[in-house]
Each structure stands twice: as structure tokens, then as C-alpha cells.
Design a protein with these regions (language model features):
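A residue-level structural signature of the nucleotidyltransferase/glycosyltransferase Rossmann-like core
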Residues: 6, 44-45, 131-132
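Acidic, metal-coordinating catalytic segment for phosphate/diphosphate chemistry
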Residues: 1-35, 41
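Short, well-ordered strand-loop elements centered on a beta-strand within folded domains, enriched
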Residues: 15-18, 43-49, 120-124
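Residues that flank catalytic or metal-binding motifs in active/ligand-binding sites
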Residues: 4, 32-34, 65, 109, ...
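A glycine-rich, hydrophobic loop/mini-helix early in the fold
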Residues: 35-65
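The catalytic Nudix box helix
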Residues: 46-47, 64-96
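Nudix hydrolase/Nudix homology domain
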Residues: 19-22, 59, 71, 97-100, ...
Length: 164
């Protein structure tokens, strides 16, 4: 069995250790992740429904693609890797903002990117059960209503992105 190692970081996002992913989550240690917002030419956002095989937030709607920054990797190398692994595409990624770790964010520093792509996509079945395009106004409404079908991380990212 392959053990996934992640970098543990301090409050300034400096690497201080490396630990197995399971330990990082169990001990609530700070670590790094990326989230990518994929928009089409109609300004709709691609959402992914997380696989029921996932250990966290299974079956909930989330950003277009996301993942942990592996030990030895940077945000800049992780984002295109995750986009390709989860959706089977490449695109020019634009960095938007970085969120600081909180309990609601799983103690992750999250670098958020955006890109434009109209598909087609090849969703990774181990990661994603479904993908769909959604109008930004519909997302605004669902996020404002605290829709339980969306991950808390996605709602936090969306509010920041939209200035809500």
C-alpha cells in the first residue's frame, strides 16, 4: 500500500516537517492544498460531486478540481497535476488568492486558481461521481442558503471569489 506524504507547514506556510496524510488529518496539522475553478465560455462553473469512495466530504459538490500538495511539490506544480488527474485536461491556470488554514478548511493553506475550458472532460471515477456546469447566480443562491450538498470549503472559496 502506498503511503501519501504531505508537507507540514507553520502559520506562515513554511515547511517544518513531513507526515503521512492520515496523521496530518488526525492531528489537525497545517498543510497545503489547491482548488481550481474551471469556467466555460458562458461563464458557468464546473462543479464536481466528490466520489462516495472519498474519506472526506463524500457525495458533496466541490470546486472543479482540488487536491493536496504532495511533499516535495509546490502549489504551482500541484494545480496542473490535479486538473489533469481529475478532469483529464490541461489549461492556463491563473492564481486568484490563498486562504489561511482554519478548522473549517481542514487546516489547509489553500491556493485557489481559475481557468477557462469548455471540455470535454474525463472525470476520474476514483475521485468524482459526477460533474456539471452551474450558473454563477445559482451557485450564489445555494451558497447563501447554506446548501448542505456543497462542501464547506467550496462555500468559503466561492464567497471569497464573489466577494459575498
Amino acid at each position: 500500500m502506498h503511503i501519501e506524504f504531505l508537507a507540514v507547514v507553520d502559520e506562515h506556510d513554511r515547511i517544518i516537517d513531513r507526515r503521512p496524510r492520515s496523521e496530518i488529518h488526525a492531528l489537525k496539522l497545517r498543510h497545503r492544498a489547491v482548488h481550481i475553478l474551471v469556467f466555460n465560455d458562458q461563464q458557468q462553473l464546473l462543479l464536481q460531486k466528490r466520489s462516495m469512495k472519498k474519506d472526506l466530504n463524500k457525495g458533496l459538490w466541490d470546486t472543479s478540481a482540488a487536491g493536496h500538495v504532495d511533499d516535495g511539490e509546490t502549489y504551482e506544480t500541484c494545480a496542473p497535476r490535479e486538473l489533469h488527474e481529475e478532469l483529464g485536461v490541461t489549461a492556463d491556470l491563473i492564481p486568484l488568492f490563498k486562504l489561511k488554514p482554519t478548522v473549517d478548511l481542514g487546516m489547509e493553506f489553500i491556493q485557489v486558481y481559475r481557468c477557462r475550458h469548455n471540455g470535454p472532460f474525463t472525470a476520474c471515477s476514483d475521485e468524482i461521481d459526477e460533474i456539471r456546469w452551474m450558473d454563477m447566480s445559482e451557485i450564489d443562491m445555494q451558497v447563501n442558503q447554506q446548501d448542505a450538498s456543497m462542501t464547506e470549503t467550496f462555500k468559503i472559496i466561492w464567497r471569497r471569489y464573489r466577494g459575498l
